[in-house]
A protein has these predicted regions:
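Solvent-exposed, non-membrane alpha-helical residues enriched in polar/charged side chains
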Residues: 10, 14, 38-39, 63, ...
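C-terminal capping/lid region of NAD(P)-dependent oxidoreductase domains
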Residues: 19, 95, 100-110, 117-136
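Short catalytic-loop micro-motif centered on adjacent basic/acidic residues
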Residues: 23-26, 46-49, 105-108
């Protein structure tokens, strides 16, 4: 595992991939993390941006992508909601993965509903792992 909060994390990624870099990066932080992710992406690699947790805009140019034949695409779940046939198919696949034991939901912490504010604070302060569940 590589900790992206460490200063040299992108070099660790390159070392872990034999100097090549990953073929696919799923990026949801934005800002400098997204920029560093693109720098360590393999030639012909693809980066999917599906969030902006840092609330910062990543900045890169088309030339950066062109020289290494890379692509960056965006994904927003809300936009998928306009395609109910895709959602239905994906939900059925997820259910099959759960039934078949290929997918496990990891619950990191539970909070009573009355402690929802505390749960949100724990998430914001990055004190949680796995899913956080509010119990009614």
């Amino acid at each position: 595992a590589i900790d992206y909060t460490e200063e040299n994390w992108s070099e660790q990624v390159k070392q872990a991939t034999g100097g090549k870099g990953p073929d696919i990066i799923l990026e949801m932080v934005g800002g400098s993390i997204a920029e560093q992710s693109l720098q360590c992406l393999a030639p012909f690699g693809r980066m999917v941006i599906y969030g902006a947790a840092s609330n910062q805009i990543a900045q890169f140019t088309g030339i950066q992508l062109m020289y290494k034949n890379q692509a960056v695409i965006g994904y927003w779940l809300t936009a998928q909601m306009s395609r109910p046939d895709h959602i239905a198919r994906a939900v059925m696949e997820l259910i099959q993965y759960l039934i078949g034991g290929k997918l496990e939901i990891i619950v990191g912490q539970t909070f009573p509903l009355a402690a929802a504010a505390e749960a949100h604070k724990a998430i914001a302060e990055r004190k949680t792992t796995g899913k956080v569940v509010l119990v009614v």
